[in-house]
């Protein structure tokens, strides 16, 4: 009798738990749910090459080509890759290749290979006439797979080592690179700060 009662209670508890979990996931904001870069960006990055834009009007200027390319699961640190990715951001394709050619880091040669692949893809698939008429609009890295392995120590002890991987993403846009923004001076920062103070909302006042 007691066993049958427990089975009935368990059968009722499982559907209620499922309904409660579904409702809580709907209420929770999306920012509370962590998704890694491999799930969030890597799956959608190269799919942006398949975007079809509406036809342009007769007098409208030509839309520049955009090339999205990436390489996943690189045996390299994402932090070391980020410094190299930031180095070439905003450069023309020839200038970026020249900078990476004389950089002795391992990630520089990997990024150079990815840029050459993206350059060939631009001419072959995206109707880009001049392969040098490209600039790097976006260049970033992301966290890849992280494998934990045993590191053997002396006297029968051990530690945990991590084998980290990273992703590299690049976006090439047809045309010359945009002009760099002028550096902001202390006066500009002071004006912005004063404007923020003047636009404050003070409650319980006129």
Curated annotation (Swiss-Prot):
The keyword Ribosomal protein applies. GO terms for molecular function: structural constituent of ribosome. Residues 1-40 form a transit peptide. Disulfide bonds: none annotated. It is found in: Mitochondrion. Its main location: mitochondrion. The keyword Nucleotidyltransferase does not apply. It comes from the Eukaryota. Keywords: Mitochondrion, Ribonucleoprotein, Ribosomal protein, Transit peptide. GO terms for cellular component: mitochondrial large ribosomal subunit; mitochondrion. One of its GO terms (biological process) is translation. Belongs to the universal ribosomal protein uL22 family. Component of the mitochondrial ribosome large subunit (39S) which comprises a 16S rRNA and about 50 distinct proteins. This is Large ribosomal subunit protein uL22m.
